[in-house]
């Protein structure tokens, strides 16, 4: 396993320069507490969780503010993460992946997200793209595309959303018309994470008639004539990853780059998104966990009216509620991850529930943490505001939380 060469580190996050504290673990301030994210894990899971926490502390947390403020895409750091197996966490080992489970993946992304939620979210999307190729591609495609994705020598972006089709993804209009041994793509995709920087674009496009059965999945490689990108979007958060439109103008792509059969694209998209919802919910857990620790430490240090804020019962109760909601969200996410791994019939509904609950609750936790920091929480010298901004979009992407409610109710009503 790729973890064999890793040092055995304790699960802790350090301090950012300039007082930008993320998570401190010394003595009684350890994760051995009621919010300990290692509870219920086996020894192997605890070990790679420690590796992920340490990587977040050393490589991500000290840089997350700079990446955010300068809008830097941390290629070198992500490639270091890939050396630990994080570039292809749930990709099969024969093409360079770590071959871990969905639960293992959730544990890792939660830990990494404490160091930089935005960067971890991109890594999770990259993993989802690699999984689609690994799971639905033929052997030639798997061995061509997956190894450089697992090492993050190459980066991947997922192209589903269009200017006119967001939640109604099955109505997408980007066309792929077959001409000989190529498809000619025309159309555009919107809000694509990594666009312009990524090397591999997993594109859902229309090869047939209207509706989901007319959609196919095609890999478009950077540098293909007819592939271009829009301007870099200015965003509230997720600033360590670029977001652009992806544009196809008579873009000729080999038929050999089609993943799966014609008309299978929507199934691939949906299957990928089930896992993507677990991944993004796990990123929310990491942001919320870091925010709870930040708030706990602030309440112990900050004094008003001659007493530490921690002595105020209202603030005690609020902190208790934050911790309780964090643990509840984590349990939901991990339960859904196991259901997805086991391919249970209720997996789609459970993934939707976990994504809905975790992203809503964890954003609320981060936002409450900012409030409890008072004016300091609104300053960019303090990390809590970045967790708020980076976790807000999780309620929108990988299927908005309104769509999650549709999927959950549909599952209940069709029983």
UniProtKB/Swiss-Prot annotation:
Pathway: Amino-acid degradation; L-valine degradation. It catalyses: 2-methylpropanoyl-CoA + oxidized [electron-transfer flavoprotein] + H(+) = 2-methylpropenoyl-CoA + reduced [electron-transfer flavoprotein]; (2S)-2-methylbutanoyl-CoA + oxidized [electron-transfer flavoprotein] + H(+) = (2E)-2-methylbut-2-enoyl-CoA + reduced [electron-transfer flavoprotein]; propanoyl-CoA + oxidized [electron-transfer flavoprotein] + H(+) = acryloyl-CoA + reduced [electron-transfer flavoprotein]. The gene is ACAD8. Isobutyryl-CoA dehydrogenase which catalyzes the conversion of 2-methylpropanoyl-CoA to (2E)-2-methylpropenoyl-CoA in the valine catabolic pathway. To a lesser extent, also able to catalyze the oxidation of (2S)-2-methylbutanoyl-CoA. Pfam families: Acyl-CoA_dh_1, Acyl-CoA_dh_M, Acyl-CoA_dh_N. It comes from Homo sapiens. This is Isobutyryl-CoA dehydrogenase, mitochondrial. Belongs to the acyl-CoA dehydrogenase family. It is found in: Mitochondrion. Signal peptide: none annotated. Substrate binds at residues 167, 274-277, 410. Its cofactor is FAD. Homotetramer, formed by a dimer of dimers. May be part of the large multiprotein complex ARC/DRIP. The active site is at 398 (proton acceptor). It is linked to Isobutyryl-CoA dehydrogenase deficiency: An autosomal recessive metabolic disorder characterized by plasma carnitine deficiency and elevated C4-acylcarnitine. Patients manifest variable clinical features including failure to thrive, seizures, anemia, muscular hypotonia and developmental delay. Some patients may be asymptomatic. Detected at comparable levels in heart, lung, brain, skeletal muscle, pancreas and placenta. Weakly expressed in liver and kidney. Its EC number is 1.3.8.5. FAD binds at residues 158-167, 191-193, 302, 312-313, 371-375, 400-402. It is an enzyme of class 1 (oxidoreductase). The modification N6-acetyllysine is found at residues 50, 231. Keywords: Acetylation, Activator, Branched-chain amino acid catabolism, Disease variant, FAD, Flavoprotein, Mitochondrion, Oxidoreductase, Transcription, Transcription regulation, Transit peptide. One of its GO terms (biological process) is valine catabolic process. Gene3D superfamilies: Acyl-CoA dehydrogenase/oxidase, N-terminal domain, Butyryl-CoA Dehydrogenase, subunit A, domain 2, Butyryl-CoA Dehydrogenase, subunit A, domain 3. The keyword Oxidoreductase applies. InterPro entries: Acyl-CoA_DH_CS, Acyl-CoA_Oxase/DH_mid-dom, Acyl-CoA_Oxase/DH_mid-dom_sf, AcylCo_DH-like_C, AcylCo_DH/oxidase_C, AcylCoA_DH/ox_N, AcylCoA_DH/ox_N_sf, AcylCoA_DH/oxidase_NM_dom_sf. GO terms for cellular component: mitochondrial matrix; mitochondrion. The modification N6-succinyllysine is found at residues 50, 213.
